[in-house]
Amino acid sequence: MDPKSPEFIIDQPLKILGFVFDELSATRVSGHLTLTEKCCQPFKVLHGGVSALIAEALASLGAGIASGFKRVAGIHLSIHHLRPAALGEIVFAESFPVSVGKNIQVWEVRLWKAKKTETPDNKIMVSTSRVTLFCGLPIPDHVKDAPDELKKVISKL
């Protein structure tokens, strides 16, 4: 993984864990992660802190896009851990806006894994989250190019 690539730049902690973005837009951010030991607790299941990291990262990216590529900051995260996901399983994640205002946005984030059998509803919910974000913050000079890098990544998905 090239640390200078635009895709790596958008969220280094998630990329280090192996998270792959599937969609980035103002109305939906999604991706997936194969669970390795890096993201599991000693009991070989997904660490709750990793679930929280995914939730805040996806909501922040979506809110940043929805705000016109302005800087955003998470001000509240509420997460419910519903079921475990084990080492080796693939966890899917999606985030979508609940409320998009000029200064405050609220995003819902869901993590799930696939059932082992084919059924009409093939999802086992792992966690659900709500993330509240403050939007429109100034972008510091040393990262002024961050919005352009994010736009490059979006154009490649």
Curated annotation (Swiss-Prot):
UniProt motif (Microbody targeting signal) ranges: 154-156
GO biological process, one term: phylloquinone biosynthetic process
Family matches, as SUPFAM superfamilies: Thioesterase/thiol ester dehydrase-isomerase
Keyword check for Nucleotide-binding: no
Catalytic residues (positions): 56
GO CC terms in record: peroxisome
One Gene Ontology term of the molecular function aspect: hydrolase activity
Disruption outcome: Reduced DHNA-CoA thioesterase activity and phylloquinone content.
Sorted UniProt keywords: Hydrolase, Peroxisome
Keyword Iron: no
Domain of life of the organism encoding this protein: Eukaryota
E.C. designation(s): 3.1.2.-
Pathway(s) where this gene product acts: Cofactor biosynthesis; phylloquinone biosynthesis; Quinol/quinone metabolism; 1,4-dihydroxy-2-naphthoate biosynthesis; 1,4-dihydroxy-2-naphthoate from chorismate: step 7/7
One Pfam family linked to the record: 4HBT
Compartments reported by the entry: Peroxisome
Family: Belongs to the 4-hydroxybenzoyl-CoA thioesterase family. DHNA-CoA hydrolase subfamily.
Other observations noted: May originate from a horizontal gene transfer with a bacterial species of the Lactobacillales order.
The protein's role, per its UniProt record: Catalyzes the hydrolysis of the thioester bond of 1,4-dihydroxy-2-naphthoyl-CoA (DHNA-CoA) in peroxisomes, a necessary step to form the naphthoquinone ring of phylloquinone (vitamin K(1)). Displayed also slight thioesterase activity towards benzoyl-CoA. Is not active on phenylacetyl-CoA, succinyl-CoA and palmitoyl-CoA thioesters.
Subunit architecture: Homotetramers.
Descriptive protein name: 1,4-dihydroxy-2-naphthoyl-CoA thioesterase 2
Organism from which the protein derives: Arabidopsis thaliana
Source taxonomy: Eukaryota, Viridiplantae, Streptophyta, Embryophyta, Tracheophyta
